[in-house]
Curated annotation (Swiss-Prot):
One of its GO terms (biological process) is L-arginine biosynthetic process. It catalyses: N-acetyl-L-glutamate 5-semialdehyde + phosphate + NADP(+) = N-acetyl-L-glutamyl 5-phosphate + NADPH + H(+). It is an enzyme of class 1 (oxidoreductase). It comes from the Bacteria. It is found in: Cytoplasm. Keywords: Amino-acid biosynthesis, Arginine biosynthesis, Cytoplasm, NADP, Oxidoreductase. Its EC number is 1.2.1.38. This is N-acetyl-gamma-glutamyl-phosphate reductase. Pathway: Amino-acid biosynthesis; L-arginine biosynthesis; N(2)-acetyl-L-ornithine from L-glutamate: step 3/4.
Amino acid sequence: MLNTLIVGASGYAGAELVTYVNRHPHMNITALTVSAQSNDAGKLISDLHPQLKGIVDLPLQPMSDISEFSPGVDVVFLATAHEVSHDLAPQFLEAGCVVFDLSGAFRVNDVAFYEKYYGFTHQYPELLEQAAYGLAEWCGNKLKEANLIAVPGCYPTAAQLALKPLIDADLLDLNQWPVINATSGVSGAGRKAAISNSFCEVSLQPYGVFTHRHQPEIATHLGADVIFTPHLGNFPRGILETITCRLKPGVSQVQVAQALQQAYAHKPLVRLYDKGVPALKNVVGLPFCDIGFAVQGEHLIIVATEDNLLKGAAAQAVQCANIRFGYAETQSLI
C-alpha cells in the first residue's frame, strides 16, 4: 500500500485526485493539505466538494513545513501553483517521496522558458534534467524509473495525443504549421473567484493569443512548431481542440487512421472514432481523450476532446502513478 499525500487538495483537480486515490486499492491517503494561509485550512474536503460527502470527509490541513507530513509517505501529488510546486518538489524528493506535479514547474527542460512564460527564475535546472514528462501514452518507459513526474498541461495533452502519431509516422507537411484552436471550460482557471470567470461575464473568447505558455510546451515535446490559440468557453469543464494540418502529397485517409490505430490500439484511455468526430459531452467526467478526424485532399482536421480536470490533470497523474508502480494503467480510473 502506497502512503499518499495530496497537496493543494482544495482545488478542482485536487478534489478529483482525492476521488481517484481514495478508491485506489494500492493507495492510502495519509493527509490532504493546503497552504498555511489558505482560507480553506481546517475545513473538510467534503464541505468544499459535496460530491465527496460520506466518501472522503478528511480535513484540509495547513502545511507550513513538509517535515510534518513527509515521514512515511511514498507518493506526493502536487496540485499547486507553479511557484509552489517549484519550491516543494525538491523538498519532498529529498524526503524520499515520488512526486507527481500537476503544475508547469518541471515540464520543459529550459530555464529561460520559465523566465519568459512563467515569470520566475527556475532554481533547479538539475531537476528539469531529471523530471520525466508524464504524457502517459508516449512516455511510459521513462516514468517507470522517475521520482519526479511532470504531468502535462491540459491543452498539451490533447494536442500531443492527436498529433504525435502523425508526426512520428512522417505523414504531415510541417512546413505548414499545425493550427490548434482549443476551447476549455471555466474550471481551467481554478476555484478562485474572479470577475472574468463569473456567470454574467464569461463568454466564448480567445485569450493568450501568441503568448500562452502551453504553445512552447506543445512545440517542445512534439518537436514541431505549432500555432496554438486557447479559448475560454462558457461551460464548466472539458476541452475540445480542432487541429488543422497539411498532409504530405499522396498521404491517404487510410494511412492517417492506421497511424492512430497503431499508436493507441493498446492504450485504453485514448478512444478513436472510426467515423465522425467527438463531442465534449462524451468525455466530461471521464478519464479519456477522444480523437476523430477528416481528410479532404491534402487537408487534415483532427478533433480531440478530454475533461481538462481528468485526462488533462488528475486522471493522467494517477495514470502516471499506475505506470510508475507497475499497476494496471486504468486502476481506479475506469
